[in-house]
């Protein structure tokens, strides 16, 4: 059976759905949900802190992991307060999965790209909650990747809800 797939437009909706799925592990793609691609260090630090605070409030969540294929790293400490908090830079999504293998199940990957985040979710057997903001707000590269991912979506996931 294929993992769950849903396309949602806001962080509130993504977190609500993760709670409904009783996910114990949440893996967040960093750009653009946590911090926009062109944002600076302060935006990354603030985004990681804010998303971690909100995600750890979901009952049953044991791990919150931020994962990006870029080299960006937060300068603030990840304070999980009872939740394991991790940050993986240069993650090599979707090819490298070893880092996530010990995380508790069920889990959800939350990100914007089917080709990287969605494929990672599929490889891990996790749900994929696709962050889908207004396409006009996306730079050309991510917009084109989104289009290509939608073409490949039927190969990775069942129909979206």
Predicted regions and their residues:
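Active-site residues of response regulator receiver
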Residues: 29
């Amino acid at each position: 059976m294929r993992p769950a797939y849903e396309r949602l437009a806001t962080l509130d909706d993504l977190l609500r759905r993760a709670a409904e799925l009783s996910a114990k592990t949440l893996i967040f793609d960093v750009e653009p949900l946590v911090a926009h691609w062109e944002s600076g260090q302060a935006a990354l630090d603030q985004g990681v802190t804010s998303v971690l605070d909100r995600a750890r409030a979901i009952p049953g969540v044991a791990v919150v992991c931020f994962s990006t294929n870029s080299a960006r790293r937060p300068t603030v400490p990840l304070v999980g307060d009872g939740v394991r908090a991790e940050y993986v830079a240069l993650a090599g999504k979707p090819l490298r999965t070893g880092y996530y293998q010990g995380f508790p199940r069920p889990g959800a990957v939350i990100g914007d790209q089917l080709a990287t985040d969605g494929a990672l979710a599929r490889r891990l057997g996790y749900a994929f909650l696709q962050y889908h903001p207004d396409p006009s707000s996306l730079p050309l590269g991510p917009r084109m990747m989104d289009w290509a991912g939608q073409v490949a979506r039927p190969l990775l996931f069942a129909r979206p809800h």
